[in-house]
């Protein structure tokens, strides 16, 4: 859970920008999107192996 306290003489836009930055650094939004819908374990395994294959091919190119 990210907390952002609005500082004295700080605009709301600046505070919102700081909040968005902390959320992106923590990976909160990415985690939320990953868990938004249920994935069957078989689908998780399939996606994991596809990602590994892509990484392997990418490393092989260079």
Swiss-Prot record:
Return the annotated region ranges for Disordered.
Answer: 40-62
Q: Which residues form the signal peptide?
A: none
Biased segments, Basic residues type: 53-62
List keywords of the entry alphabetically.
Answer: Ribonucleoprotein, Ribosomal protein
Keyword ATP-binding in record: no
Originating organism: Limosilactobacillus fermentum (strain NBRC 3956 / LMG 18251) (Lactobacillus fermentum)
MF terms from GO for this chain are: structural constituent of ribosome
Q: Which InterPro entries match?
A: Ribosomal_bS21, Ribosomal_bS21_CS, Ribosomal_bS21_sf
Q: What is this protein called?
A: Small ribosomal subunit protein bS21
Q: Which Gene3D superfamilies match?
A: Ribosomal protein S8
One GO cellular-component annotation of the UniProt record comes to: ribosome
Record's family?
A: Belongs to the bacterial ribosomal protein bS21 family.
């Amino acid at each position: 859970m990210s907390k952002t306290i609005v500082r004295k003489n700080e605009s709301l836009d600046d505070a919102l920008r700081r909040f968005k930055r902390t959320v992106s650094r923590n990976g909160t939004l990415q985690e939320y999107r990953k868990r938004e819908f249920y994935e069957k374990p078989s689908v998780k395994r399939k996606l994991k192996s596809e990602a590994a294959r892509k990484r392997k091919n990418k490393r092989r190119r260079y």
